[in-house]
Amino acid sequence: MKYLRFAPILIVAMGFFLSCSSINCPLNNRVMTVYKLAGDVTPLADALTISTTRTNGTDSVLLNQAVNVDSFSLPVSYNRPQDVLYFQRQNTAGWSLTDTVVIEKQDFPHFESIDCNPSYFHVIKRVSHTRLGIDSIVINKENVNYDAKEAHLLVYFKNFYQ
């Protein structure tokens, strides 16, 4: 009878331990595309601003006036078959060039656990772009997932200072 007073504490403690899950969600659960500058223009001395248009029609700046960059990461949409990005390059003299980059991709839902947030992985199918300030863009790694160690796209900017 004297042990019955510990029953509520024991029930709460058992409930606490039984509610814990052995599945851990990944800490790095953001799917980002890694861009690496290649060629003669690394790092890029000009200010680089990258924006996109959201599904509701408003603009969103993804990278704001980055200077002396040689790589950067950008988020990937999960509800559109292609991402349209606007690369604006501006130097200290004031001239500005804007290139449009279209990344065609295929989205795949990725399931870890019921406890984890949903995520999408992607396969880059094709990249097209205007050629005002960008010379070329090469697909280096087509699978976009949690692993952001290797560059997915290599960007070759034109050199205007030669």
Regions picked out by a protein language model, each given a short descriptive name:
Residues 16-19:
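C-terminal motif of bacterial Sec signal peptides marking the signal peptidase cleavage site
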Residues 11-14:
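Alpha-helical transmembrane segments
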Residues 5, 65-67, 131:
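Generic detector of solvent-exposed, compositionally biased contiguous segments
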Residues 21-27, 71, 75-162:
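Extracytoplasmic cysteine-anchoring/structural motifs
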Residues 1-7:
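Bacterial N-terminal signal peptides that target proteins for export
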Residues 21-77:
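Start-of-domain marker
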